[in-house]
Amino acid sequence: MVRFQVKRQVNIDASRGARLREALDILERIVNSKSFRLRVLEHSAYTWNEGLTNEQILNRLIWGQPTPPLGALAVPRLVFFDYELVQRPIWKKLSSVRGWRIPETNDIYTYVDAFDSMSPSELASHLGHEVVGHLAGEFDHPSRKGPERDASVPYVIDDFIEELAEKLPLDEAA
C-alpha cells in the first residue's frame, strides 16, 4: 500500500486544500486497487521503462524499488511531496501543460488556472502523473509530445488513473 502526503502547501487556501485532499484520497484508492495493479501488469508497451518488466514497474511505483523490501506488505509506503500553485505566465496561456515536477526533488507545481478547472478526479489523474509516475516511481519521459512520450510510464499511469477514476468507487483493495 502506498499513501501520499503533502509536506508543504504553497498558495493553497482552505477550499483548494479540501479539493487537494479529495484528489489524494481518490488517487490512493485507485493506486491501491486491484484494478490499477492489473492495468499496470497487463499493459503491452511502456517506453522509458529502464528495461524493467511490468511487475518491476508496479513494484517501483508502489514500493519505490523493482523488488518489494522484506515485510513491505505489512507497512504502507509514505510518499511525501511539496505542492505549490503558481500563476501561469502570459506567454504560456495557450499551453496544455497543467503542472510539472522538478527532477530529483519532491517539488510539484500546478498552474492555478489548471487546478481551478480540474475536478477532484482530474486532479487525481494529474497528481498520479507527477506523484506516482515521477516521484514514487522515479520514471521520466521525453520532453516533446509524441508517441514515445504518450507511452512512457508517467503518461500511461496518468491515463490508467483517469480511466479508473471514472469507475469509482473502487471498493476492492489490492
Regions found by a protein language model. Give the residues of each.
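Walker B catalytic acidic pair
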Residues: 130
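Predominantly extracellular/secreted Zn2+-dependent metalloproteases
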Residues: 1-124, 134-174
